[in-house]
Every structure is written in structure tokens, then in C-alpha cells.
Amino acid sequence: MTLSSDMSDVLAEETDIDVVGEEDEPRAEEEEEEDGELLMPRSPHCSSTKDPYKAAGSGGVGRSALVKPPYSYIALITMSILQSPKKRLTLSEICDFISSRFPYYREKFPAWQNSIRHNLSLNDCFVKIPREPGNPGKGNYWTLDPESADMFDNGSFLRRRKRFKRQQVPELVLREPGHFLPASAYGYGPYSCAYGIQIQPFHPHSALIAFQQQQQHQQQQARHQQQQARHQQQQARHQQQPPSLPSMAAPALMPPAAQDLSRTCTFYPHQLSPAALPPSLQSKSSSALARSTFSIESIIGGDLNPGPKAAGVPVISRALVTFSSSEAAAALGGNLQPGTVLTNH
């Protein structure tokens, strides 16, 4: 009995070991299945149902190796543009950078190329730069807007802080298609440390201020030139006037009383005394009175003695006395007798 009990204990231990070992039973079942497969002919339906599982198992290992990067398309485009020397790339160059850095996108190319194109066109943080006339190639360049430097949170491409909205720039700052942004426009402080870019930060409003100052300076120069041209024209007009008529050339420089006096002297050169005339006309009027005997008294037949008759002297129209005494004497042949009346023909 003792031996039988010992043998039973050993058998119990062996059975316990077999139950705990989970790998032995499937192997036995697989051996039985293989024996059954050897004995029984394999049907095409069974083989077709068993192959997809093997294929799925082999394909699952390949898919697990290609993990999609945790970056958005905007972050991928920003990475590619910042690593370029000129901070601008074409669509094909952006796709080449993403494919070379991330195996997932290398295997999925070109399925995601349209997504890159749409993100470039629809997001304001990307700016299109036309290709130079002398630079052959296909496609335009793309760069980053200088004001989108704080688009990502603390310079991390995993988190985007906010959606960038481009501000409306005045038309005065718009550049021609052949002109491009300066090199200082591509400096970004938050990203320069990660990519080894050491460029001075770009101030977007400096170009606008400089342009406005330049335009104001040009307008001031144009106004100054116009004033100089007007002044020269006025001087030329004064120089072209005949010097024999000082009363016509100098009224603007005389005081108002002298201007009225000069106009009166033009029509009544012999009614005024030489002392009341301007200095420029005193010598001329005195010489004319000395040469001619023509006077108002000779016309009206009065005498030279002042008296009560002087108060009744009629006023002669300005149209009758519009010529000098020398011209009147020449017209009458030098014969002018007292009592002769001149009429306007």
C-alpha cells in the first residue's frame, strides 16, 4: 500500500505539471492536426481560409514598424522651410524633405502630397513667392510669414498656439513680382536654436515706416521744386517788361498810396505838381513841362492867375487826356492857340 500510495503521488505530480504547462497541449493538438492533414487530402477551401491569417500576421509586423509622426502638416511644412538655406522651398522640395525624414510618409507617398498643397494654399502663415525670371524651374516658392513666429507654443511643433490670421497690408508696401523679401525677413527667434539658424529677427513694420518717410521726403522735394519754378517764372516776367514804364512794373512793390498815385499820374501827368510825383517821374514830368507850352489853361482859355475861376474849372474826362503833351503838339503840327478845344474822334 505504501508503494502504491507513493506511485499515486508521483503520478499526481506529473499530471499537475502537464496541466500547468500550456505549451505541451497545443503542440499535441498541432501534431494531431498535422497527422490528420497528412491522412486526409486538403481541400482548396480550407487552404484559402488559412492563408489570409498568415498573410495578416506577416503584414501586421510591417505596419507596426511604420508609425505616423505626431506632427501636423503645418508643422511638417514649417520644419522643411526653416531648414532650407534661403528659407523658401517649392512643393516638390517640401515633399522630398518630409519623405527623407519620416519613413511613414516615404511609404505613403504620393497620397499625402495633395494635403501639403492644400495646407500651403489655405493657411495664411505660408506666403507664395513667384519664381525669378532668370531662375528656370517649375512651381513657385513658399516661405513663412514673418508675423507667424509665435504660431507654435514655445517653439514646439507638437502644439500650435492659435490659427494665424494675416493682417491687411497697405497697397503701398506691395512689391513687384520680380522683387523678393530681404534676407532678414526669414529670421525666426523660437526656431533658430533648434535648427542652428542665427539670423536677426525681422520687424515687419520697419519697411512700411521707411517707405512712408521716403514718400514724404519726395513730396516735400517736389513742392520745393514747384515753388522755385514759380519764383523763376515771376522773375522772368518782370525782366521781360519794358524799362520805360516803371509805373507798370513796380506797383506790386509800392505801398497802396503810392500805387494809386502812380495810376493817377498815368492819366494826368501835367495836373500834378512835380513835388507830388514819385521820384522816378519827377525828372520826366519837369522836362516835358519845360519843352511844351500845352496846359489845361490854354485849352479852356483861362489865365494863369489863380482866382475864383479856378473853382469853376470843369473836369475833363480821362479819355480826352490819354496822351502826353509832346504827342498832342505833334498831332496839331505845333500850332496850338489859346481857346482851342480838343475833341475825341
From Swiss-Prot:
- State the SMART domains in the record: FH
Q: Report residue spans for region: Disordered.
A: 1-59, 211-252
Q: Which Gene3D superfamilies match?
A: Winged helix-like DNA-binding domain superfamily/Winged helix DNA-binding domain
Q: Which residues bind DNA?
A: 68-162
Q: Where in the cell is it found?
A: Nucleus
Q: What is its main location?
A: nucleus
Pfam families tied to this protein = Forkhead (PF00250)
| Tissue distribution of the protein | Expressed in gastrula (stage 10) embryos in the dorsolateral mesoderm, where expression continues until mesoderm involution. In early neurula embryos (stage 12.5), expressed in the anterior neural plate in the prospective diencephalon and eye field, and in the anterior neural folds, with expression becoming stronger as neurulation proceeds. At stage 14, transiently expressed in two stripes lateral to the midline. Expressed in premigratory, but not migratory, cephalic neural crest cells. At stage 20, expressed in the paraxial mesoderm and in the optic vesicle.
PROSITE patterns hit by this protein: FORK_HEAD_2 (PS00658), FORK_HEAD_3 (PS50039)
UniProt KW Calcium keyword: no
Bias (Low complexity) occurs at 212-252
Q: Which GO terms describe its biological process?
A: anatomical structure morphogenesis; cell differentiation; ectoderm development; forebrain development; mesoderm development; negative regulation of cell migration; negative regulation of DNA-templated transcription; negative regulation of transcription by RNA polymerase II
GO MF annotation terms: DNA-binding transcription factor activity, RNA polymerase II-specific; RNA polymerase II cis-regulatory region sequence-specific DNA binding
> Which residues lie in Acidic residues bias regions?
11-37
Q: What keywords does the record list, in alphabetical order? A: Developmental protein, Differentiation, DNA-binding, Neurogenesis, Nucleus, Repressor, Transcription, Transcription regulation
GO cellular component terms, alphabetically, are: nucleus
Record's superkingdom? Eukaryota
Q: What does this protein do?
A: Transcriptional repressor that down-regulates bmp4 signaling in both mesoderm and ectoderm. Regulates mesoderm patterning by repressing ventral mesoderm genes and promoting the expression of dorsolateral genes. Can also neuralize ectodermal cells directly. Inhibits neural crest migration. The transcription factors foxd1 and foxg1 mutually repress each other to pattern the forebrain.
Protein name per its UniProtKB record: Forkhead box protein D1
Q: Lineage, please? A: Eukaryota, Metazoa, Chordata, Craniata, Vertebrata
Q: Which gene encodes it?
A: foxd1
